[in-house]
């Protein structure tokens, strides 16, 4: 498996950001680590083994990045308005700086002149971020695999709400999205999977709410609820990835 390490200065964040790229060709996948995670977690938690059939066959290239959750979602003692602005700077880093890098990389590696959408993938809080990117920017992300996420920003902000927190809280902005909003047509041209178990440490409430909202709005989304033995942990996420990938890549 080809692995590359990159470090770029982010103007949005005012600091260096690191990432690893796994694979030599194929569709781009953006992996967002779990809460407070780092770019090497895809490898450190052995997702390289789980994704290997698709990476080594040239079907996907996985871009694994850093979070800044320790400054934002986890930084409960800091000013919530500052934390929200800082999180939005991370979103700007992804959409304005990282996405062009991903686009250039996959086009060069595949000999493409066009640009396919990116799959957003994450587990736990990484799933929260992945789903938010998918729903906020359907022009950039055409698929999502979100495992064991929470789809409200209330988790990180404990009831504080402003415009920035709102636009990072899918159950809030999707519930208020007009039925004729152009994003809905885009969602329905894409493929999305939201999965959660019902075992230890899982929180299902916002997944059920997200499913309800998407049904009301006519948004196509595969929401899959697994059993009471399915825990919020890596062994189950390793089982879920190969179950859903054939659908998402088909």
Per-segment meaning from a language model:
Residues 1-250:
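Non-catalytic cap/lid and distal C-terminal segments of serine-dependent acyl enzymes
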């Amino acid at each position: 498996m080809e692995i590359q390490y990159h470090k770029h200065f982010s103007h949005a964040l005012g600091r260096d950001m690191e990432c690893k790229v796994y694979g030599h060709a194929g569709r781009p996948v953006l992996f967002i680590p779990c809460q407070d995670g780092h770019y090497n977690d895809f490898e450190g938690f052995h997702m390289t083994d789980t994704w290997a059939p698709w990476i080594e066959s040239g079907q996907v290239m996985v871009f694994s990045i850093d979070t800044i959750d320790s400054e934002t979602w986890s930084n409960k003692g800091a000013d919530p308005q500052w934390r929200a602005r800082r999180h939005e700077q991370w979103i700007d880093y992804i959409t304005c700086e990282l996405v062009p890098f991903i686009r250039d990389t996959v086009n060069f590696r595949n000999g493409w002149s066009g640009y396919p959408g990116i799959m957003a993938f994450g587990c736990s809080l990484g799933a929260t971020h992945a789903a938010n990117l998918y729903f906020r920017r359907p022009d950039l992300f055409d698929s999502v695999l979100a495992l064991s996420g929470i789809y409200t920003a209330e988790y990180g902000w404990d009831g504080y709400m402003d415009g920035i927190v709102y636009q990072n809280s899918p159950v809030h902005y999707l519930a208020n999205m007009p039925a004729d909003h152009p994003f809905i047509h885009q969602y329905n041209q894409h493929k999305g999977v939201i999965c959660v178990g019902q075992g230890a440490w899982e929180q299902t409430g916002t997944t059920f709410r997200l499913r309800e909202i998407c049904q009301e709005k006519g948004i196509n989304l595969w929401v899959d609820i697994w059993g009471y033995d399915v825990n919020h942990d890596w062994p189950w996420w390793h089982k879920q990835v190969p179950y859903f990938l054939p659908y998402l890549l088909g």
